[in-house]
């Protein structure tokens, strides 16, 4: 399995958990502060579940573990399992509070994400550590919602015409951390 890290400039393959821990369990106000101007990270597994010998469109299983964080609301996790060439994809999002699925965080790249999908840093850390320790399996330590069960407005379209309808519900926006 080929492991790729896209996490604040850390090298691939996946880092040891202790290298990621401060981003989740550091002192408040310093959590999720990156050297680079971003609020996102990813851990990728190409050829998971014993499929590393298969080609990209020959049934290889790839797993993407996306993270979007904000120091005051926590981390939103997405676990996506893609079986290449089969059209069989599964996507799950962390979820914390369904009452906040109609309020949004605007990330560094302008996308809107429902605040109810963000979980506390401590919970996100348990899930990230479990993901690393189980070679990319969907962590069982947090609650997930299947992508097909998400309300359509959980991740609104990023086009300006559509986002205009959501502007009054954006309660947090990305701000670069201290340099």
Where on the chain are the PLM-derived regions?
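Amphipathic, interaction-prone secondary-structure segments
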Residues: 33-85
């Amino acid at each position: 399995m080929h492991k790729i890290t896209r996490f604040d400039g850390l090298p691939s393959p996946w880092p040891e958990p202790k290298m990621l821990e401060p981003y989740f369990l550091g002192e408040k106000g310093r959590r999720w502060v990156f050297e680079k101007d971003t609020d996102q990270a990813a851990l990728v597994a190409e050829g998971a579940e014993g499929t590393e010998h298969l080609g990209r469109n020959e049934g290889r299983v790839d797993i993407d573990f996306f993270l979007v964080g904000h120091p005051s609301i926590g981390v939103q996790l997405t676990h996506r399992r893609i079986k290449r060439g089969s059209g069989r994809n599964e996507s799950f999002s962390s979820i914390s509070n369904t009452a906040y699925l109609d309020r949004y965080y605007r990330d560094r790249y302008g996308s809107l994400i429902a605040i109810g999908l963000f979980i506390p840093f401590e919970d996100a850390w348990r899930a990230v550590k479990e993901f690393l320790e189980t070679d990319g399996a969907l962590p069982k330590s947090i609650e997930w919602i299947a992508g097909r069960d998400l309300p359509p407005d959980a991740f609104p379209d990023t086009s300006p015409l559509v986002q205009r309808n959501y502007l009054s519900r954006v309660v947090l926006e990305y701000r670069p951390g201290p340099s």
